[in-house]
């Protein structure tokens, strides 16, 4: 049990680290990166709130992990109710933030795609996060499934941070995102196999499909059907 608690604590810390590194230039260490993108009011205020809500989620799962590690299960469950509220905030601000970014003049700042095309990416990240965290809440009395769904849901939320980790220039962002996502799922699968003799169903049927979905997003986004939906959604803000 101690090894298991240490493992999941390390996995959460890895996700926290990716968020801090990815968003350091535009959020956490904004003053140290004068060339980073800026937003005009009221967008700036919204994205500050969005960043705070996402940061609160990351801090919460770290605290929750430490509570379980310290066997403070009762407090962990009480804090879980507040975590539900924060999770809703993450999903809602994620979707609205994507619509806001896509509807501005010039569309999304970095991706070289029309706004209605790229919109699918953050919309799916927020949707997967909501579904997986919802599944974790449903499975809260099944600890092994619960903790894996929390991790994988948070991994989905972290996609925007991972793509911003660009050690070899902007073009390396998607490669880093895919590599880190696959590495995370593989490490989880190896842990499952070594400790239980099999890959946990959540890891197998949620983790790997989550990674593979990355390769289906742009083929779907390039269809006329999605682009029509994307244009309709962007007109809402």
Question: Model segments located where?
Answer:
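Alpha-helical membrane insertion/targeting regions
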Residues: 1-237
């Amino acid at each position: 049990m101690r090894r298991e608690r240490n493992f999941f604590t390390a996995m959460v810390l890895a996700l926290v680290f990716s968020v801090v590194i990815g968003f350091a230039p535009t959020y956490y260490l904004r003053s140290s990166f004068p060339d980073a993108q800026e937003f005009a009011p009221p967008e700036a205020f919204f994205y500050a709130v969005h960043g705070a809500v996402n940061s609160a989620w990351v801090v919460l799962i770290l605290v929750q992990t430490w509570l379980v590690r310290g066997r403070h299960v009762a407090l962990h469950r009480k804090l879980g109710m507040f975590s539900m509220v924060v999770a809703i905030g993450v999903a809602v601000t994620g979707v609205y933030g994507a619509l806001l970014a896509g509807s501005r003049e010039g569309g999304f700042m970095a991706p070289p795609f029309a706004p209605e095309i790229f919109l699918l990416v953050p919309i799916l990240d927020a949707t997967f996060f909501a579904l997986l965290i919802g599944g974790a809440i449903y499975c809260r009395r099944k600890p092994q499934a619960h903790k894996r769904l929390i991790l994988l849901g948070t991994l989905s939320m972290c996609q925007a941070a991972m793509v911003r980790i660009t050690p070899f220039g902007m073009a390396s962002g998607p490669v880093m995102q895919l590599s880190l996502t696959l590495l995370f799922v593989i490490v989880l699968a190896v842990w499952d196999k070594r400790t239980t003799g099999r890959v946990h169903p959540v890891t197998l049927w949620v983790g790997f499909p989550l990674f593979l979905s990355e390769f289906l997003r742009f083929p779907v986004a390039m269809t006329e059907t999605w682009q029509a939906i994307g244009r309709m959604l962007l007109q809402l803000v």
